[in-house]
């Protein structure tokens, strides 16, 4: 027997016309979508408890799950179209894929098993929440964020193909798992990926991609990143500023995973078996210049966005020399890095007097110093 709670307003009061807290279902469907309403009722509370429902709670449902899911799908489609990705091409063997691919497919296999088992036991709440956590924590905030460069790079190699195949498989499988909960969203994603309805597909079996060692090491890595970022925050040290080293708890990680931790914490060297995360916060001149270069990249990325460039657009950049000596030294030493990060085919240093003759420029500010930049589509 399943007993459902009542639908009440956000303050826990029963709906009443006299209170003016009655929600019109058609209004909710029109403004948030029927899938969002369904998903809210599946995930917001345990069966038997009351559902505190309002426009704010449904808006949060859309923002916290459907937008991140659609962003993952949109990211894949954007780059798959640019590279003419063909899902029918030969699959890259699992043992030849990047550790992030192997980790995500292991997490996906676990998710398929957990969701299927939960539904077989008439539990819809925890399976839906597991899908939510997978999409947000594993797929969006870790796999795609850590793999962006693999999709961005211009050369089409085995690693890029493996990234496409992994993300394609994850989106297809998530759509199948999502179908009983959010049928319209699931069908839209699945149909656009393979041309048929998700509701005509078989329920997925857990893929044989479990890798306990990779999952265990990746969890240690992610925990270390959380601790390291907290340590940076307590030291008021921006992540863009490189540091010489960090010591983290736990056993030594495989190099392919340790490299991820170094990049996330922006440190040059990583040691292990520390009682807690410890950072070397001594800033040498070389580290300072590299940090300035990263600040320049951020300013240029914001300018790209402001000017309406797409993520894949190549650009030409000219800049007038800043007065601040360290800025100019950072640019000269890290030109290749800056160019690569902002997809600039050219990065040209021009005369300070050019703004007088070519006024169509933008000012960017880096560490309190402003200087003019010209950016055009290549």
Protein language model features and the residues they cover:
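Short, solvent-exposed helix-loop connector elements
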Residues: 49-58
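Feature 926 captures the class I aminoacyl-tRNA synthetase adenylation module centered on the KMSKS loop
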Residues: 3-30, 34, 58-378
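Structured mid-domain segments that build the active-site/substrate or prosthetic-cofactor binding neighborhood
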Residues: 43
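Non-catalytic, structured segments within soluble enzyme domains
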Residues: 39-40
């Amino acid at each position: 027997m399943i007993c459902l709670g009542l639908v009440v307003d956000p303050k826990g009061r029963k709906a009443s016309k006299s209170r003016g807290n009655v929600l019109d279902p058609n209004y909710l469907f029109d403004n948030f979508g029927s899938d969002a309403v369904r998903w809210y009722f599946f995930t917001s509370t345990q069966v038997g408890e009351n559902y505190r429902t309002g426009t704010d709670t449904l808006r949060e449902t859309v923002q916290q799950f459907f937008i991140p899911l659609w962003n993952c799908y949109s990211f894949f489609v954007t780059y798959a179209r640019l590279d003419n990705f063909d899902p029918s091409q030969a699959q890259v063997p699992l043992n030849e894929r990047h550790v992030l691919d192997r980790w995500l497919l292991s997490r996906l296999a676990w998710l398929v098993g957990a969701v299927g088992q939960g539904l077989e036991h008439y539990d819809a709440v925890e399976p839906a929440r597991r899908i939510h956590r997978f999409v947000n924590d594993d797929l969006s905030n870790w796999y795609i964020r850590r793999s962006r460069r693999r999709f961005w790079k211009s050369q089409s190699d085995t690693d890029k193909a493996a990234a496409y195949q992994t993300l394609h498989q994850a989106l297809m499988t998530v759509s199948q798992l999502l179908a009983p909960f959010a049928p319209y969203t699931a069908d839209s994603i699945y149909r656009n990926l393979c041309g048929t309805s998700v509701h005509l597909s078989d329920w997925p079996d857990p893929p044989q991609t479990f890798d306990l060692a990779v999952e265990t090491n990746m969890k240690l890595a992610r925990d270390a990143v959380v601790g390291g970022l907290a340590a940076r925050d307590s030291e008021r040290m921006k992540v863009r500023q490189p540091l010489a080293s960090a010591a983290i708890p736990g056993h030594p990680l495989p190099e392919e995973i340790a490299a991820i931790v170094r990049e996330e914490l922006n440190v040059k060297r990583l040691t292990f078996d520390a009682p807690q995360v410890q950072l070397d916060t001594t800033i040498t001149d070389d580290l300072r210049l590299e940090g300035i270069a990263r600040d320049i990249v951020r300013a240029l990325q914001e300018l790209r966005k402001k000017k309406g460039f797409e993520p894949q657009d190549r650009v030409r950049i000219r800049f007038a020399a800043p007065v601040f000596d360290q800025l100019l030294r950072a640019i000269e030493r890290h030109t290749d890095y800056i160019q690569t990060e902002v997809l600039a085919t050219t990065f040209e240093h021009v005369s300070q007097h050019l703004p007088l003759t070519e006024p169509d420029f933008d000012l960017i500010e880096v560490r309190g110093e402003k200087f003019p930049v010209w950016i055009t589509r290549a």
